[in-house]
Amino acid sequence: MYKFETHLHTSNCSACAVSSGYDMVDAAKEKGYSGFVVTNHFYHGNTCVDRNLSWESFIAAYCEDYEITRDYGEKMGIQVFFGIEEGFAPGKEMLIYGISPEILTAHPEFIMFGAKEKAEFIHRMGGVTVCAHPFRSRSYIPNPDKEPDISLFDGIEGYNYCNAPEENEKALAFAKKNGLFATSGGDVHNSKNFGNAGIEFETQIKD
């Protein structure tokens, strides 16, 4: 079996992360994972990247830590894939998979899109959208019990290591009720917490 973490942040790109990409690769190796997806906070999230940069420079800076992590992963036998976590409302975030840095660079209008436009764009580009940590109850999140708009998402993060058990139970039930696939993510910010979630595949994945 091939195990992958689906939700992970690195400290040089996500302001809330503690560990570097190097530490994350080492942790993946130690815990017996095949790889992970780097889903750093994007433009409308808790990013370290200067939003005053030109769009092209912003994307280059945003992707730099992913690229460093990917290259180190190759040396260590750990696959590292590119993803995004983008905010679309207070405390509400979208995990995006299957979109390349080149696509982002070519579409500066992406930062102006609302949630629906973002989802439609991702789908046109062949990507996948997943609702991150639904039903999460935090002081900064208004209406935590509000159900996700299923028109925006292909899947739901049914298990998030940082969510309470009852929040994950609601997420899984929501995914099942609405015919959406469910993912499992560690929402890893510290390499010490690597290994508490993920998805297993029977065959090696390429992208």
Per-range role (PLM):
Residues 1-11, 20-26, 90-106, 120, ...:
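Charged catalytic cores and adjacent phosphate/nucleic-acid-binding surfaces used
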Residues 2-4, 35, 128:
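Structural motif
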Residues 6, 39, 84, 132, ...:
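Active-site flanking residues adjacent to catalytic metal/cofactor-binding acidic residues
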Residues 10-11, 35-47:
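Ser/Thr-glycine-rich phosphate-binding loops at phosphate-binding pockets of nucleotides
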Residues 23-39:
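Catalytic domains of carbohydrate-active enzymes, especially glycoside hydrolases
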Residues 33, 78, 178-180:
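A short helix->loop->beta-strand "cap" motif at the edges of active sites that frequently abuts
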Residues 42-157, 162-163, 205:
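Extended substrate/RNA-proximal surfaces in nucleic-acid metabolism proteins
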